[in-house]
């Protein structure tokens, strides 16, 4: 059945208390640990190599890493080690909710104390980007970014203005999106809204609380996120003027690298399925990538070429073609948060 969602886990572990599961909605999975739960004991060195395609653990209980330089897949498991390139890298501290910079040269994650850290891919150069205040839980950072537009000046200083880490902050059970400059600076709330003019004129304002699971994509600072009370997925775009669009029922969204498509989780007949659709306003058709699911597929991530979606299952990590042309195949027995290095 549905796994638990993660946005309250990091602080709960850091404070060594027990947190209850928080349901996203009846339309999506419950918030689960997904690599944000710290494991005890020594780091495990994963075996390099391929994967099992049965959707079940490898025969004999053998651990299958499933990551490689070719497939760009990485897996953070809530321990000190992160699986990548067919092996594991020891970061010297607990790594939860790892995300990559747009150029693949840095990672950002939540450490065992609940703070935001950045580091090089080999775990070196760790730096504290921001410290979580007491009583707040931070989770699921994503690296927002924008490229210089073709006009060169449509949005002044867009590369610096949108070079941010966006994450979820949970204070007293109230969820909000917050952001901090990737180069360091003050933490401030990111409040998705609609401007009073332009295409969003007259549109209702989206919820300001209950927002979680931000995911950045594309070259114009787009952010997908979920709203827990509504059980809805949204896309926020303030590149030219603020505009927030309701994509529909679901949770745990991820934008494709070009921001042209979105994948999200929705519960169907007792299991969590993966759905995709275009982000274009006039293309609302959805496709179930897992129509015959007999297990839960959660926490999806796009490959750099946009052709593959990886997702967590109770048995590890599976991948599925983004066009739905084949059934999911298990590639790793490691249980954690899948994310692709650009």
Which positions does each model-derived feature cover?
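Sequence signature of WD/YWTD-type beta-propeller architectures
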Residues: 2-342
């Amino acid at each position: 059945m549905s796994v638990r969602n993660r946005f309250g886990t990091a602080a709960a572990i850091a404070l060594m208390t027990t947190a209850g599961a928080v349901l996203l909605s009846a339309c999506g999975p419950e918030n689960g640990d997904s690599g944000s739960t710290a494991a005890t004991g020594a780091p495990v060195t994963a075996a390099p190599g391929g994967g099992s395609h049965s959707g079940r653990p490898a025969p004999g209980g053998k651990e299958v890493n499933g990551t490689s330089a070719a497939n760009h897949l990485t897996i953070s498991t809530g321990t000190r080690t992160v699986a990548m390139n067919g092996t594991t890298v020891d970061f010297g501290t607990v790594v939860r909710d790892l995300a990559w910079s747009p150029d693949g040269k840095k990672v950002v994650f939540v450490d065992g104390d609940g703070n935001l850290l950045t580091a090089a891919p080999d775990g070196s150069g760790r730096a504290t980007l921001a410290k979580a205040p007491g009583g707040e839980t931070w989770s699921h950072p994503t690296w927002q970014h924008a490229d210089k537009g073709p006009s060169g000046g449509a949005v002044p200083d867009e590369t610096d203005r949108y070079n941010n880490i966006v994450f979820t902050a949970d204070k007293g059970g109230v969820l909000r999106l917050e952001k901090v400059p990737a180069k360091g600076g003050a933490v401030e709330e990111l409040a998705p809204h609609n401007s009073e003019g332009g295409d969003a004129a007259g549109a209702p304002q989206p919820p300001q609380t209950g927002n979680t699971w931000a995911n950045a994509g594309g070259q114009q600072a787009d952010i997908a996120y979920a709203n827990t009370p509504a059980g809805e997925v949204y896309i926020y775009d303030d590149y030219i003027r603020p505009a927030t669009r309701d994509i529909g029922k679901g949770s745990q969204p991820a934008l494709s690298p070009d921001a042209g498509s979105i994948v999200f989780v929705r519960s169907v007949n007792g299991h969590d399925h993966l759905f995709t659709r275009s982000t274009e306003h006039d293309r609302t058709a959805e496709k179930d990538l897992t129509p015959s699911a007999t297990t839960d597929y959660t926490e999806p991530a796009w490959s750099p070429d946009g052709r593959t979606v990886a997702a967590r299952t109770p048995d590890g990590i599976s991948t599925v073609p983004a066009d739905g042309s084949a059934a999911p195949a298990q590639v790793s027995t490691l249980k954690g948060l899948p994310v692709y290095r650009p």
